[in-house]
């Protein structure tokens, strides 16, 4: 029998509607489950069990009367710490940040509350969201439920840990270079970065998106129905549009599917990861897709230019802090950002311009193919005490080569589990579609999920 904490959100809503399970009953089980896990994982921030109980009790009464306040009434959702929730501080993962309550909900949080979801908690992030790691000077170390010695990746580290551990079905992250997809890959999840502007976000920035992190495609689609709503605070958001977020699979026959296995720079993919990606690609071919190998999009000049731009940007922000506060930043992040002081204005601009070169290359590629398959991560989840796979602040982004182009090109990109390593750690397949083809891409993901079958044996708390 499936444990309550393993049920998808779509199933929970059906049970609430039929009064076969109340939000209050579900939350008592869920809170006990979280209490067994959380001392080992450290995934949550601003977790208040009594507040959650009270909100679940109110939702129970509404369902009893047949008057839910929204389509997600009573469902739990976690929200990444970087996404503002009214009245709660946003430490940005760093002990250097002054803790001031947010004046209002950011757009994604507002949409989920309007739909009736209960914000279970915020989730942990590394300093300033600038690591693909669960290390934070404010939150501490967040660990991977599949192996507590390993990293979740980041920067949506707590969201990934919470989803893999079964802290409810719905989780929300953000992604500027892979921060939804990388931890989703390392934790066995569905992680979706939509087209830029599909989910309004505040503050907005070049390449920055919010996106769902779930165990299954149905729950990803469920979240997108309510997240992809207009909000005037995001000047980059797409025009209002009625979209079909149905979960129906579709045929891939005749699709031109590119397979990219060579990153062009950075870390080379492990052999067992390549084998899993090639096996997934063969499924597309067996179902009628036209598979072809495509050349790398990234090269060293693009990656190094982006590094120059990002570190100069963060250093400019750290200079606004006094020396005492700056000293509280995670040493790895401080050492990396401090290098921004040596980046000239000319080099910073050249680095920023590399984001447009990524965009041009991405657009050209999708003139030749309909869909792209790549590894999400080149390597297996790395040790939990590392800030990056190489743990070298002078080479911080060697692992984002497959993910970052689609932030800058603005294409929707999905990570979905396609197997496990010999050590039992998840392997992520990244599937990328042309700009604005978000609903189509998620139906492709649903199709692949059907071929792959469900994941069994989700992690259990150590005491179990």
Outline where the language-model segments fall.
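Short glycine/serine-rich loop segments
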Residues: 104-228, 407-421, 425-428
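A short helix-breaking turn/cap at a secondary-structure junction
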Residues: 190-275, 298, 451-464
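Small-aliphatic-rich amphipathic alpha-helix that forms the alpha element of a beta-alpha
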Residues: 361-363, 393-417
């Amino acid at each position: 029998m499936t444990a309550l904490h393993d049920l998808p959100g779509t199933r929970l809503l059906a049970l609430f509607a039929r009064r076969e399970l109340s939000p209050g009953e579900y939350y008592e089980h869920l809170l006990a489950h979280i209490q067994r896990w959380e001392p080992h994982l450290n995934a949550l921030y601003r977790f208040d069990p009594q507040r959650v109980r009270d909100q679940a009790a109110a939702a129970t009464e509404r369902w009893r009367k047949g008057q839910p306040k929204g389509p997600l009434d009573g469902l739990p959702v976690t929200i990444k710490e970087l996404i503002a929730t009214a009245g709660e501080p946003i430490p940005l993962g760093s002990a250097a940040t002054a803790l001031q309550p947010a004046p209002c909900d950011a757009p994604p949080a507002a949409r989920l509350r309007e739909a009736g979801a209960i914000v279970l908690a915020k989730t942990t992030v590394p300093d300033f969201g600038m690591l693909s790691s669960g290390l934070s000077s404010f939150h501490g170390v967040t660990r991977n439920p599949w192996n507590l010695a390993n990293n979740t990746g980041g920067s949506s580290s707590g969201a990934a840990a919470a989803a893999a551990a079964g802290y409810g079905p719905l989780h929300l992250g953000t992604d500027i270079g892979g921060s939804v997809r990388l931890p989703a890959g390392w934790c066995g999840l569905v992680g979706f970065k939509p087209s830029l502007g599909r989910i309004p976000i505040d503050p907005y920035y070049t390449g920055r998106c919010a996106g769902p992190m779930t165990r299954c495609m149905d729950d990803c689609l469920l979240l997108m129905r309510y997240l992809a709503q207009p909000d005037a605070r995001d000047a980059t958001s797409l025009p209002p549009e009625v979209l079909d977020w149905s979960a129906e699979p579709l045929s891939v026959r005749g699709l031109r599917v590119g397979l990219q296995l060579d990153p062009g720079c950075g870390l080379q993919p492990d052999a067992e990861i390549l084998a899993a990606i090639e096996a997934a690609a063969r499924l597309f071919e067996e179902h009628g897709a036209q598979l072809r190998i495509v050349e790398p999009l990234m090269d060293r000049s693009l990656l190094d230019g982006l590094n120059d731009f990002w570190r100069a940007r963060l250093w400019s922000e750290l200079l606004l802090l006094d020396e005492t506060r700056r000293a509280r930043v995670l040493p790895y992040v401080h050492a990396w950002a401090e290098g921004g002081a040596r980046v000239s204005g000319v080099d910073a601009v050249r680095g920023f311009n590399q984001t447009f070169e990524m965009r041009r290359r991405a657009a050209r590629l999708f003139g030749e193919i309909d869909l792209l398959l790549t590894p999400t991560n080149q390597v297996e989840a790395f040790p939990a005490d590392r800030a990056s796979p190489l743990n070298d602040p002078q080479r911080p982004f060697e692992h984002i080569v497959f993910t970052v182009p689609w932030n800058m090109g603005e294409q929707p990109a999905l990570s979905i589990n396609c197997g496990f390593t010999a050590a039992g750690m998840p392997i992520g397949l990244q599937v990328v579609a042309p700009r604005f083809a978000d609903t189509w891409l998620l139906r492709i993901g649903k199709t692949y999920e059907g071929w792959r079958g469900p994941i069994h044996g989700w992690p259990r708390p150590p005491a179990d």
